[in-house]
């Protein structure tokens, strides 16, 4: 199942020529989701060719305008494009969004908008994966989101099937590998007889704007990718604390403690718009497998077969 991330906006509070306001587009199988929706997100979607038609779920981390103001134009464009399917919007402050949508007359669109509040530990389930909200530490009420794939079936043990159970290669192998029981020579063969231990599904964690927290470390444990706020260098740590953000070094420390496979730094302050290498260098001293998010950067989350 394809699990693909596209960064639509990677700037901090203020957009720049190089970086748009925060937004991440995620495709997981047949689901298309948006995480945050800053100013100009719909145009970024047009450039990236993500499409609007199959976008049914938008997850907002907090209600600072650089993370949600792009919702309004996107919602109206969907209506003008004759959308009829319900749109789900998730946020840590549902009542505020409901009031704004009502004020903008969005109760009269040709489709319904369902706003749901998500608190720490609450989840939204999809086919094969779930999105879990987790508490973050910002200057307003905020959450991050973990995209967690269901555990996968274990690897098929061909040698055991053929030599120990006497099942010849062929269609029966495929059924067992899919988790289906079969009958061979009057005996029922269940998948657990030929499959190894379940394999952990893929996991991507996005903090939104946040200080480094134990909760982030906990939910990001062994994640394939951690996308973490890295607004400033360590020399501006006092300002990071005051404004509810993280330094690149702090993001790397979270990644190291959580034992993630890859760290992606985002929410890059305009101080570093033209050259974010100082942030990258700072983070790599703590956690080597770190990259800086760039607008329109896409990557596929692959299976770890180790």
Swiss-Prot record:
Pfam families: Lactamase_B_2. Keywords: Endonuclease, Hydrolase, Metal-binding, Nuclease, tRNA processing, Zinc. One of its GO terms (molecular function) is zinc ion binding. It is an enzyme of class 3 (hydrolase). Zn(2+) 2 binds at residues 66-67, 209, 267. The active site is at 66 (proton acceptor). Its EC number is 3.1.26.11. The keyword Hydrolase applies. Zn(2+) 1 binds at residues 62, 64, 138, 209. Its cofactor is Zn(2+). InterPro entries: Metallo-B-lactamas, RibonucZ/Hydroxyglut_hydro, RNase_Z/BN. Binds 2 Zn(2+) ions. It catalyses: Endonucleolytic cleavage of RNA, removing extra 3' nucleotides from tRNA precursor, generating 3' termini of tRNAs. A 3'-hydroxy group is left at the tRNA terminus and a 5'-phosphoryl group is left at the trailer molecule. Belongs to the RNase Z family. HAMAP family: RNase_Z_BN. Homodimer. Zinc phosphodiesterase, which displays some tRNA 3'-processing endonuclease activity. Probably involved in tRNA maturation, by removing a 3'-trailer from precursor tRNA. This is Ribonuclease Z.
